[in-house]
Amino acid sequence: MSAKSNKIGVVQLTILTMVNMMGSGIIMLPTKLAEIGTISIVSWLVTAVGSTALAYAFAQCGMFSKKSGGMGGYAEYSFGKAGNFMANYTYGVSLVIANTAIAISAVGYGSEFLGATLSPLSIALWTIFTLWLATVLNFGGARITGNISSFTIWGVIIPVVGISIIGWKWFDSLMYVNSWNPHNVPTFEAIGVSISMTLWAFLGLESACANADAVENPEKNVPIAVLGGTLGAAVIYIVSTNVIAGIVPNLELANSTAPFGLAFAHMFDETIGKVIMGLMVMSCFGSLLGWQFTIAQVFKSSAEEGYFPAFFKKVTSKDAPIVGMVTITALQTLLSLMTISPSLNKQFNVLVDLAVVTNVIPYLLSMAALAVLLKAENVAPQKYKTTVFVAFIGSLYSIYALYAAGEQAMLYGSIVTFIGWTLYGFVSYKFDLKKSQAN
């Protein structure tokens, strides 16, 4: 059998990209967006354009970069080892925060599924338990985790795609219109408030080109698949969250901790709603399981490069970085306690805004370095101009996302970033001293 026959085509890669992008990030979004109103559809459209630009630019980064380390390697083209460190550091921190938010999503759906009412402290404690359970289950290595995650992802995809297709039968256009801007917030402010939540659903787009080696004619097909996959995910996100807004009354939706389960209960009955909640809990935990291992691998890779402490690269006989996983989960435990809020939704919102801010920093570093990356790899002039322009659009959107995340998220995000620069000072001798001596 030839090597070419083992390659996947552009349609297959488009579907794969779309499925990989559709994780557990969406399952709490209808609630958050209901707090703003159906005007949030404008935020979805803005984010769809911005995310597509970012995904396309990252596809080009992945295709042409000769440096390892993902976004850190891209950033190094312009910002040297300091940029590489900061991209890895802020990305790692964002994943630590994001996983805590995913755990809270699982707790929210789980409490609704079991009919339990949780106090703020109980929410934090159950979140901590969920995080540690996912960590312990990862001690067996990546293979089991990968198999479970590839199965449980369908617990999100089936309900989300399903409601996008059949939900229109129960859609009430008058309810949707009346929910447009229930609190009469100024239009620009209302759109901005929703931006970080809509971007949250697309986090992970930076890995859109991860399957480039398995594709026929990657230089042509990978960008097409990335654009198609990102736009496809955007359509499903926009349709699913907006159709729910025409099925469930705005006030009820805004106070729910399991919006998709609530929507299916309105469409059918309580039993179906419970089944959907169960699927979402399963999917959320499966996603958490995979991401907890991924975070440990990100920290392990950074430790191997000399950026993070050496204990992060210690692995067991099953290649599981247990010391790193335990350290990361201890940080998440602290984060869960520090962000205790009056309600589960408020705690989720705080974590999402902070995760988005810290995740956008490596996005900006990568976009800013793309021009140098393309020049260094002698990319054709027309492709260079197109890609740099698209990266500029992605950068503008990223800056807007930072602004829209709010003062609190920007304050904490800035502190996290300044801590990063301080930490780099303690490891920079490994890189910058060698450079000075060479000169």
Regions found by a protein language model. Name each.
Residues 12, 45-46, 113-144, 157-165, ...:
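Transmembrane alpha-helical segments of multi-pass small-molecule transport proteins
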Residues 73-76, 80, 112-116, 227-289, ...:
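TM-loop-TM module centered on a large, flexible mid-protein loop between adjacent transmembrane helices
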Residues 165, 358-359, 385-439:
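A generic transmembrane alpha-helix motif of multi-pass inner-membrane proteins
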Residues 2-5, 40-41, 115-122, 150-278, ...:
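Helix-loop-helix junctions that connect adjacent transmembrane segments
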Residues 7-17, 80-94, 126-130, 185-198, ...:
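Select transmembrane alpha-helical segments in multipass membrane proteins
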Residues 76, 103-126, 159, 214-218, ...:
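Helix-loop-helix connectors at the membrane interface of multi-pass transporters/channels
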Residues 31-35, 53-131, 135-139, 144, ...:
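Hydrophobic transmembrane alpha-helices that form the core helical bundles
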Residues 1-31, 35-39, 51-56, 68, ...:
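Membrane-interface "cap" regions at the ends of multi-pass membrane proteins
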